[in-house]
């Protein structure tokens, strides 16, 4: 049947000369860190689930799919923004002087506990021909205060959907004994 998943962009071999150096170095770069994809049963059609926020490539994941009366429902997550503090990290470090910008973005994303991007659980609706007909952001189990939203990335993700449309996943939320402690807990999404 129709399947979903995600992967990185293909890597390109590029020649890059760091500032202050005379000799070019070989680097491997890619356009985005991860992208969700839907693939038809016979493999002849593939649909990338590009995030609405795609600066530095953005991110998306497709975790589950179900057949519906009018097509398919796919759930996962996608990037929605970059917090100010993370953007400052990018501006300070990813200047295309020591390494290609995309390499720096990938390293920063890997080295920061919650990554560079704010990500939200999402539901995509596709028709029988795998055309995307709607994209619905499903929300998160907490509302970050202004300071938190500037400093940290927050994530929710939809992991599975059943035939009744119930969507389950995980979300950052506050620890009940201490509002300053952010945890990731299992959730279900109802009405976004």
Feature map (PLM): residue ranges:
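Residue-level hotspots at or immediately adjacent to binding/recognition sites across diverse folds
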Residues: 1-192
């Amino acid at each position: 049947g129709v399947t979903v998943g995600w992967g990185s962009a293909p890597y390109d071999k590029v020649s890059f000369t760091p500032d202050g150096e005379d000799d070019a170095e070989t680097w491997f770069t890619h356009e985005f860190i991860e992208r969700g994809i839907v693939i038809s049963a016979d493999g002849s059609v593939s649909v990338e689930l590009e995030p609405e926020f795609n600066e530095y490539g953005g991110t998306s994941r497709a975790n589950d799919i179900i057949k519906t009366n009018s097509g398919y429902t796919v759930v996962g997550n996608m990037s929605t923004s970059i917090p100010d503090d993370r953007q400052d990290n990018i501006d300070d470090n990813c200047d295309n002087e020591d390494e290609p910008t995309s390499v720096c973005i990938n390293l920063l994303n890997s080295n920061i506990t919650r990554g560079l991007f704010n990500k939200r659980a999402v539901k995509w609706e596709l028709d029988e021909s795998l055309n995307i007909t709607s994209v619905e952001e499903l929300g998160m189990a907490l509302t970050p205060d202004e300071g938190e939203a500037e400093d940290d990335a927050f994530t929710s993700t939809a992991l599975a959907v059943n035939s009744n449309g119930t969507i389950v996943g995980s979300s950052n939320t506050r620890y009940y004994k201490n509002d300053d402690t952010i945890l990731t807990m299992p959730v279900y999404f109802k009405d976004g």
